[in-house]
């Protein structure tokens, strides 16, 4: 994205036009954000800024569009109607290193997500997530270890790559260019020639 377009988007979207600008904003208000963090389509994400000192995001974290991260709960607006007492609910959220949070996941307050964790699309994380695991569902539960997931992906990637090529050829009558197969590049290219960019 060129610089002028980026500046206009960030003005229109109040600093949420691109990942770099939004992360800069989060750091400025007090969120602890590590290195190599990408927030995809930040204007579609809802990261609680009410208590920025209660949120930590580690290194190599990828957060996809539609993700919500909450450090507080406003349900006291109902319970205070019972007796006039406001019962605050603020809790820390810690996301450790090498974490992938898929589209439309919700991370609730008082949650710690360990290292090397994948959170599935649409999941609602209400409890801590241990290291080296994949979580999914509502509420999110551990569905397998990261090692099991990695093995499963490696077993299916060739079959999926063939499906991508066949579908593309069927639709267009042409063989796809390499860039269409970016997820499968290491099936047919030397890994040493590439530095994979997220």
Each PLM stretch: what is its role?
Residues 24, 38-112, 139, 145-147:
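Flexible, glycine/small-residue-enriched loop-and-beta-strand segment within the central core
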Residues 29-30, 59, 92, 125:
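Short secondary-structure boundary/capping segments
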Residues 133:
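Short acidic-glycine-tyrosine-enriched beta hairpin
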Residues 103-118, 123-127:
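Beta-rich strand-turn-strand
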Residues 30-34, 96-97, 115:
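Intrinsically disordered, low-complexity Ser/Thr/Pro-rich tracts
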Residues 136:
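Catalytic binding pocket for nucleotide-activated donors in carbohydrate/polymer assembly enzymes
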Residues 1-31, 35-36, 140-198:
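Terminal amphipathic alpha-helical/low-complexity segments used for targeting or macromolecular assembly
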């Amino acid at each position: 994205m060129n610089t002028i377009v980026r500046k206009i988007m960030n003005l229109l979207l109040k600093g949420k036009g691109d990942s770099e600008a939004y992360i800069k904003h989060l750091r400025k208000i007090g969120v602890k954000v590590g290195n190599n963090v990408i927030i995809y389509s930040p204007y579609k994400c809802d990261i609680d800024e009410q208590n920025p000192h209660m949120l930590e995001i580690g290194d190599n974290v990828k957060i996809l569009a539609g993700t919500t991260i909450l450090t507080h709960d406003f349900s006291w607006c109902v319970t205070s109607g019972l007796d006039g007492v406001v019962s605050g609910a603020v809790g820390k959220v810690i996301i450790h290193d090498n974490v992938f949070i898929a589209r439309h996941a919700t991370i609730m307050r008082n949650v710690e997500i360990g290292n090397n964790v994948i959170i599935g699309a649409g999941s609602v994380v209400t409890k801590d997530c241990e290291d080296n695991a994949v979580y999914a569902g509502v509420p999110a539960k551990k569905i397998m270890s990261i090692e099991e997931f990695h093995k499963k992906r490696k077993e299916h990637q060739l079959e999926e790559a063939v499906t991508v090529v066949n579908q593309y050829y069927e639709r267009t009558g042409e063989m796809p260019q390499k860039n269409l197969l970016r997820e499968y590049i290491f099936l047919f290219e030397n890994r040493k020639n590439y530095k994979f960019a997220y």
